[in-house]
Amino acid sequence: MLIDDFLNYLRYERNYSNYTIGAYSKDLDQFQRYVREHREGVFDPGEIDSDFVRSWIVSLMDEKLSPVSVNRKLSSLKSFFKFLMKRGIVSANPLRLVSGPKTKKPLPYFIKDSELEALLDGDGFDEDFEGVRNRLVIEMLYDTGMRRSELIGIRNVDVDYEAMQGKVTGKRNKQRLIPFAEGLKNLMLAYTEVRDREVEAAGEWFFVRKNGNQLSTGIVYNIVKKQLSEIPMLAKRSPHVLRHSFATSMLNNGAELNAVKDLLGHSSLASTSVYTHTTFEELKKVYHAHPRAQKE
């Protein structure tokens, strides 16, 4: 009951997405099961202390969960107990003195502009409805830096061809306008022409399946993974790699960090600044290519 109350709070008061709420629900259900297994079937948050939480962390590590996954679960649990404290259900947050496992934060993967241009200009896309749509999915993710959840949430009314911009809904239902260039506009018009001709049940959603239903995040992931597999030696193939590539390309070509932050829909510069590390790695590569830099 308490977990349900917390999830409703996230949904109706914090405007969290269904995807995020699902992640919280999964983490908290897992913790609740652990508590019941070790407390004779009783789940009483008021009886949970720091040592018990630490024992849960050990059990998660024993299950070979990555430090990143463990820390995400701890974050969910910490938010849950903050909620309980505000409601006066518990007097203290047992996670206040608990530290998660240390993690190495890797630099974002990104794809070189030349590799993506070769992919998009190549013949790896069919000329039917799905081929035209899939090409636009790749192009739009890379050209705008939007999230896949934002892409599938675009409605036809959100696209303004005259103003060359589209409205997307990001995390916590925050809306922002994203500009698009002439080339992307032409691809969008070509897609809608094929879609409206071949998909009878196409409704309010901009990106649809053959049956007219809205695309899912899973379908977008599979589209991107399949198409990016044509780029050799690519360590990671996901929609977020295209978002990383957009940000890295913008910064490498002189865009201001604040402007990239707004385009990505980040709430703070801290989230965007990770891409400056990637561009600095590029600068180091350029520097080391200099003859003088190669001398011992």
Language model regions located:
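Conserved catalytic core of the tyrosine transesterase superfamily
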Residues: 1-296
